Amino acid sequence: MRSMKAIIEYLLKQALINLQQSGEMPIDLEIEIKVENAKDPAHGDYATNLALVLAKPCRQAPKVLAERLVAVIPVDPSVEKIEIAGAGFINFFMRSTARSLIISEILNKGKEFGRGNLGQSQKVLIEFVSANPTGPLHVGHGRGAAFGATLGNVLKAAGYDVTLEYYVNDAGRQMNILAVSVWLRYLELAGEPIVFPANGYKGQYVYEIAQEIWSEQGNQFVHPWISVVENLPADEPEGGDKETYIDAIIARAQSLLGKDGFANFHQHALKTVLDDIKDDLQAFGVRFDSWFSEQSLFEDGSIEKGIQALKDRGHTYEREGALWFRATDFGDEKDRVLVRANGQTTYFASDVAYHWNKYDRGFDRVIDIFGADHHGYVTRIKTAVKALGHDESALDVILVQFAILYRGGDRVQMSTRSGSFVTLRELREEVGNDAARYFYVARKPEQHMDFDLDLAKSESSDNPVYYIQYAHARICSVLRQLKERGLKWDKDMGLKNLDLLEQQHEATLISLIARYPEVIQSAAASCEPHQLAYYLRELANGLHSYYNAIQLLCEQEQLRCARLCLLESVRQVLNNGLAILGVSAPESM
């Protein structure tokens, strides 16, 4: 069944064709027909500014064009009347019978209502979170997790074949820093008088990993502290450079422990932290189809293949012993190093190989979701994709601003390396999964987010997730009252008497639930799940207003059954929308 908005768009398109065929309008017009929901019921159900858009190319007054369009719009049984307003807006009033058909559709389709075929089964890969496995996820990662998972659900509902992927950065320098941090805590457990590096990972989890290795493997990896720091450059507190110092201590650890010994700490730390990340995300309702290892790119030769592909296309050159990618040829601000003079590949080389791999797996569209601090990566990734011969328009990079927590009006401080950060797990335990999932996606991803912990825990209409869930619970309560009072709900009778739904609150609710498929399609097309969050709050507001104004379980059986059909339709839409957001729909509160 086509949505009412789709019906109006079709009617306007036919009107345009009619005017073009009669010579009253140019044939070569490239106009996008936009139909919006009317903001005021007095102005109908839907409106379009098509006449205003046509005014310039047609060199005619908008109101004149509106009159011509309305005169040739085909008759449709769904439309009661069409009016011209203001400078040339065209307002559509739908028949109550057309609006009521949506109730029947919702009751028939249930959980499938709202699903469409915008994506036409196109294969989409969404990579998100991808936090370094060097510690627990923090609240900033939580926003990316909620956004990515919800976007995946929205795209699935719109007919895309979606794969969710976490890129595990298990081959980089940060993992080496974690491994050496664990080893130093291990030495501390052995009684060595270590001085922990300024750039090491200081969280409690580092102690716990070290304790586990000590308990399982004993003192076989112990070396005297003096042998660890002998002839090393100074650390930051002693006036040195912390980056230089941590690299030096990593090299010393690799030398003292040997390849297998250092790998023992590396792998133990990786497995422990990654398992914790997986458990955390699972508990948050975020489930990945694929955990892609960066290390696998080295093991299967993908790094070399990606670099060779750029070489073969003439997009590289050597300078000062390093291999460079001609990124400026593709719009980047500067060229990028692929292989350093010491023979080590860069993070960028891994990114090139990873995106080569993504396209090689046959995805029609690739979506990268990065934290806002990765804004510098966007251009370089797109230039690499273009240089490799792939369609850069099939790559979307979405930047998600980190969340800032507030408690009691004061900002909560967090810092990853210092170990004092607020974890996603702590946030979930304080406000619950539902509040976290909703609050994280309630704004555009590029907008800064102030997460009010007190608001998220409040049981009031100011808390949007509580307000929406309470609307669902209220409807369930009405259905329970029905049984308690021994009243009857005959769905067939209700569907036959939907014309009795004459109250303005009822017309508003019917218009709102009819919009749900359009909201899903729009959110999918623009990659903006917040549209659904806004919509559900609007629908909940309509329900609460209806509940407070109307006697729902009235004595008149035909009207009561019709109202219950409407209520069940609203409940189903709330349920469907909340499921996409990853939020529960409680039956009582």
UniProtKB/Swiss-Prot annotation:
Record Gene3D superfamilies: Arginyl tRNA synthetase N-terminal domain, HUPs, Isoleucyl-tRNA Synthetase, Domain 1
Reactions that this protein is recorded to catalyse: tRNA(Arg) + L-arginine + ATP = L-arginyl-tRNA(Arg) + AMP + diphosphate
EC numbers: 6.1.1.19
SMART domains xref list: Arg_tRNA_synt_N, DALR_1
GO molecular function: arginine-tRNA ligase activity; ATP binding
Broad enzyme group: ligase
Subcellular location(s) of the protein: Cytoplasm
Cited InterPro entries: aa-tRNA-synth_I_CS (IPR001412), Arg-tRNA-ligase (IPR001278), Arg-tRNA-synth_N (IPR005148), Arg-tRNA-synth_N_sf (IPR036695), ArgRS_core (IPR035684), DALR_anticod-bd (IPR008909), Rossmann-like_a/b/a_fold (IPR014729), tRNAsynth_Ia_anticodon-bd (IPR009080)
Keyword tRNA processing: no
Chain positions of motif 'HIGH' region: 131-141
The entry's keywords: Aminoacyl-tRNA synthetase, ATP-binding, Cytoplasm, Ligase, Nucleotide-binding, Protein biosynthesis
GO (cellular component) term, any one: cytoplasm
Any single biological process term in GO: arginyl-tRNA aminoacylation
Coiled-coil ranges per UniProt: none
Assembly behavior: Monomer.
Protein family (similarity comment): Belongs to the class-I aminoacyl-tRNA synthetase family.
PANTHER family: ARGININE--TRNA LIGASE, CYTOPLASMIC, ARGINYL-TRNA SYNTHETASE
Protein name: Arginine--tRNA ligase
Protein source organism: Legionella pneumophila subsp. pneumophila (strain Philadelphia 1 / ATCC 33152 / DSM 7513)
Upper taxonomic lineage: Bacteria, Pseudomonadati, Pseudomonadota, Gammaproteobacteria, Legionellales
Gene it is expressed from: argS
